[in-house]
Amino acid sequence: LGPMKEGQNMWQFYRHRFMRILPPFLIFMVLYSTLPMLWGQIDSATSVKDLSRIWLNFPTLAGHLWFMYPLISLYLFIPIVSPWISKASAKEERFFIVLFLVSTCMPYLNRVAGEVWGQCFWNEYHMLWYFSGYLGYLVLAHYIRVHLTWSRSKRLWGGGLLMVIGALWTIYSFYCQAVPGEILSTPVIEIGWAFCTINCVLLTAGTFLIFSTIKAPSAPRWVTEMSKLSYGMYLMHIFWLGLWAALFKHNLALPTVMAIPCIAVCTFISSLIATKIISLIPGSKWVIG
């Protein structure tokens, strides 16, 4: 995502990025606020409420659209941070990344020590607030792509190790809390995949390191095509997810260990096919990006 292209100003960047993501985003906000009435998933009162709040937040049945807001925020901030990223040395970026990594430990630290580093009910902007959040991922990715001098073998094995540690940590954080018969709130039990937690950073960085070992002059055609369709797939996949979950879990009553991969694969394929069909329609960029 960053830094901006040489010679591109802030307004050109905004126009290019937001013209791609905002129209489809708004269209799917309307669709998630209305279409579920057809199969009885929401009533008219909920639909009206969701439509009236489109400018404030995502609809009731479109929880996955939460990520659009951090993405929009990143796009807004990239022109501001780009001059620093373009000129920052490896050491300067490492300093930022270290503080970012410490900030990703704070959800766990809060469990043990309570409020820390200026946190209180009248101040959420703790000491590391400006080094926290998804901007850290952007700087980390730039550092790996530009400054990291590891060999291909070191990236492969190091990335694999980080992936394994991050994945095991995430899995363990759930299983050590999910006690049968004990009711826990969702934010408590889902701390392990709160995205800006250290284990998710390890898993993400490891994956990026492994991908960086792929040496090819250009991506295969099917990868490029899928990449172009990925935004539309993301926007619509919850429609398909509900359908396949109902089929595999309720109608066929498959065990969870079988149902989850079946739901995932079918949702992915359905979203891919539907997005591809829509892409053939003139003006489809306003719907799927």
Q: Where in the sequence are the language-model features?
A:
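Alpha-helical transmembrane segments and their immediate juxtamembrane cytosolic regions
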Residues: 1-289
